Amino acid sequence: MGLKLWVKQRRSLPFIIGTIAIALFTDLFLYGIITPILPFSLVDRVGISPDRVQSVISTLLAVYAVANIAASSPIGFLADKFLTRKVPMLIGLIFLTSATALLTFGNSVPMLIVARVLQGLSAAVVWTVGLALLVDVVGADNVGSTMGGIFGFISLGEIIAPVFGGIVYESLGYYASFGVCFIILLLDIALRFLMIEPREMKNDSTLQDVERTSILQRQDTQDHELKPKRSGLFSSLCLPIYSLLHHKQIFGPFWTSFVNSCLFSAFDATIPLELKTLFDFNSLQCGLMFGVLSTPYFFCGAWAGAMVDRRGSRTIGKRAYAILGCTLFLLCIPRTNTSLNIYLFSAFLAINGVVLAFTSSPGFVQSSHYVAEYELEHPTFFGHNGPYTQLFSAYNIVYSLGMIIGPLVAGFLRDQFNFITSIACLSLLCFSASLMANSCFTDRLDSE
């Protein structure tokens, strides 16, 4: 009885959602812990000259994204070949553990690059397969509030990681900063092994009935649809979801995701150096400022996602991006090293954090609803495993492109011109996302 109860808990919706949330949290934590440390460790530990730090940081951010892009389509293809989504999730842990070890003990730029490549491979797995599993278990109608809540929770990784990294680096040194990483990894490993996803419940009679019904429904329409046969290699590189890129309900969310990625990665590349230059901050203070940016995300994420579920994506998306395009310029006001300007910069970061919380859910909700409706009309189009792995695989590629372009462009503009020029470029991207949301997204009333 006790064993059956434990199995029941392991396959429960809260346990699965919690496992996915911890996996995403771990990915962000291990990605973010080094953000406030790099400007200092590259000089003190690796021996990089100060004038090369910006370019090396941008490179490390970019190679992470390149690895993510290279892996996303093959992972999206291969993940659907496994009987469960759990297997690729476990494979991702191998990449993540190896990356963490290299970041901990690596003392050269090539070793750090390899570590970031492995992190990119791990992220491609967890963000593609994990989010697909999430939509599998909660359904498209609840994806906004669920993702909003998860994004709010995993923003703790973005909050805690830089702060923790800065505190421990300042007080105990480089190696101690990564000790907690392995503890979190152990928790992540345990949860991924313990989780029982719906696909593993093959012996459950109810599930068999559902599968039998689903197969019959698909077979009824299969004869009416002709799909080109693809070789395995071609399928892995050209998933069916890509043929929908000309649909505005897909292209629009992809563009807003690209903009979000540019914003976050540009912040990672420029804000620590701007704080160091403008206010003479150390790694701890830089980490605390990232906490100021991310904390509003934690408190507003679920609320913003629930609003999108209830009202739709267009109004919230277009307004959030338009407001963000304006509030970014607040960061340009403090230009001298005074206590007042430090407080102002903190307040302006918090304001932008609140607005950012309202930009994450609209695109995900819009595209998830659209592919769900498209699959109802074309049941065999995405294959027997449905659209979500493919959708989030494509999202990974788009987001990773932003992670390449964002830090490189923002870092270049800051080096060649100034921080204000970088912010102006990011603001233009936000306004373009607002226009895209207005023309490509829909509200609930529009679809009724």
From Swiss-Prot:
It holds the Pfam family MFS_1. It is a multi-pass membrane protein. One of its GO terms (molecular function) is transmembrane transporter activity. It is found in: Endoplasmic reticulum; Membrane. SUPFAM superfamilies: MFS general substrate transporter. InterPro entries: MFS, MFS_dom, MFS_trans_sf, MFS_Vesicular_Transporter. It comes from the Eukaryota. Belongs to the major facilitator superfamily. TCR/Tet family. This is Uncharacterized MFS-type transporter C18.02. The lineage of its organism: Eukaryota, Fungi, Dikarya, Ascomycota, Taphrinomycotina.
